[in-house]
């Protein structure tokens, strides 16, 4: 018997075929686009190095919703629960502070062995892993400087941490058969008027060159660098600005990370993608939702998320853009936060794949901006939801909001027991 979903699917196929879109091909393309989920939503960026320590680096996780993960086993279980509710290919993005060891490990001494459980788990769940050195929430970052620190010994500590992190990243890629993107973000900056803005940037430039000096197989590891406008306590000066890292990534041919919350509120990273791609080999995206500042709210299916997805698809950047998420909301169920944000990113990618881009390009080239706008708006009403629901069914995930029932059941059975 034909189900309601199948009827809607058949009608959707016809509607999209009328504008030249093959929905089966769109779903095949969607399966080429993994989204890297960030582990730190699950525990408010606490990590396992010093879970009771305070979060520093000019970032904040606000809220106190019960049930956050307290160890790696709980975090992996929570991730599995979330991933069951998200269709299609996924990756996991880890920070160095999520290492596992029976004894304390200095950050400049981390090794692949401290992440072997994550690798075995990733293999079992058919996931790729990405990585980040953790240059925050540490006594040697307390004064607001790491890779650009004026003290040679402190700066060297962070250089060695990033070097060690690259080896961990390469281990991920070698073990899992898919390159790990390792992103370097540092909180370095000053609260008030800064007299010497040049010297810290000179030190950062030299430090980064030392960090990436060891040649690693690009099939296993990709270097990325990330800028930021400001952070709490670093409102007046950020060493790693957009101009600094754009220049660095261009001159060193690393990947450039664009975080949706790391620019002025009137700027959007969707407009930066095509410009950056002219100069850098690859991009890493941190899709987030800044509310007035880099607040890292859960990603919505809003105009900017859609614009980011459309830029990737319209310019066929599948093999040059790595899609990651970066938000941490401690005021709501953390598993639901993952599910909402990741599903929204995937919905945006699907909608972009269902766009009649070829026809729109023709109209634009012909100067018919009236028809361009009309088509862009009318396509929003095409039945993409039916295509999404079929995609979810094929991946054995809930199509609609019924996924929330599973989250609530898990919350009652598991999260509520954590105190």
From Swiss-Prot:
The keyword RNA-binding does not apply. InterPro entries: L-rhamnose_isomerase, Rhamnose_isomerase, Xyl_isomerase-like_sf. This is L-rhamnose isomerase. Its cofactor is Mn(2+). It is an enzyme of class 5 (isomerase). Binds 1 Mn(2+) ion per subunit. Pathway: Carbohydrate degradation; L-rhamnose degradation; glycerone phosphate from L-rhamnose: step 1/3. GO terms for biological process: L-lyxose metabolic process; rhamnose catabolic process. Keywords: Cytoplasm, Isomerase, Manganese, Metal-binding, Rhamnose metabolism. It holds the Pfam family RhaA.
């Amino acid at each position: 018997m034909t189900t309601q979903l199948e009827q809607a699917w058949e009608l959707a196929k016809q509607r999209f075929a009328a504008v030249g879109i093959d929905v089966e091909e769109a779903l095949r393309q969607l399966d080429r686009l993994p989204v890297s989920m960030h582990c730190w939503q699950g525990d408010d960026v606490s990590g396992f190095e010093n879970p009771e320590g305070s979060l520093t680096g000019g970032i904040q996780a606000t809220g106190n919703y019960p049930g956050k993960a307290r160890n790696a086993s709980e975090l992996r279980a929570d991730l599995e629960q979330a991933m069951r509710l998200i269709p299609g290919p996924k990756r996991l993005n880890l920070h160095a502070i999520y290492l596992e060891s029976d004894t304390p490990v200095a950050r400049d001494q981390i090794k692949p062995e401290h992440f072997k459980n994550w690798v075995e788990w990733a293999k079992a769940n058919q996931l790729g892993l990405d990585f980040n050195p953790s240059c925050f929430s540490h006594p040697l970052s307390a004064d607001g400087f790491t890779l650009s620190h004026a003290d040679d010994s402190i700066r060297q500590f962070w250089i060695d941490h990033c070097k060690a992190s690259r080896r961990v990243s390469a281990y991920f890629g070698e073990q899992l058969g898919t390159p790990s993107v390792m992103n370097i973000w540092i909180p370095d900056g000053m609260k008030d008027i800064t007299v010497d803005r040049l010297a810290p940037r000179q030190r950062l430039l030299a430090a980064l060159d030392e960090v990436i000096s060891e040649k690693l197989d690009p099939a296993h590891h990709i270097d990325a660098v990330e800028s930021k406008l400001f952070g709490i306590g670093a409102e007046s000066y950020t060493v790693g600005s957009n101009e600094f890292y754009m220049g660095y990534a261009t001159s060193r041919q690393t990947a450039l990370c664009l975080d949706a919350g790391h620019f002025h509120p009137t700027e959007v990273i969707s407009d930066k993608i095509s410009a950056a791609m002219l100069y850098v080999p690859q991009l890493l995206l941190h899709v987030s939702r800044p509310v007035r500042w880099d607040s890292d709210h859960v990603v919505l299916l809003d105009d900017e998320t859609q614009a980011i997805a459309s830029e990737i698809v319209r310019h066929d950047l599948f093999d040059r853009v790595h899609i990651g998420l970066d938000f941490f909301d401690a005021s709501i169920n953390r598993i639901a936060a993952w599910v909402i944000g990741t599903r929204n990113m995937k919905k945006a990618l699907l909608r972009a794949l269902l766009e009649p881009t070829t026809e729109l390009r023709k109209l634009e080239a012909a100067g018919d901006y009236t028809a361009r706008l009309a088509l862009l708006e009318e396509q929003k009403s095409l039945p993409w939801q039916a295509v999404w629901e079929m995609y979810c069914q094929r991946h054995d995930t809930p199509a609609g909001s019924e996924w929330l029932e599973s989250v609530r059941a898990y919350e009652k059975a598991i999260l509520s027991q954590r105190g």
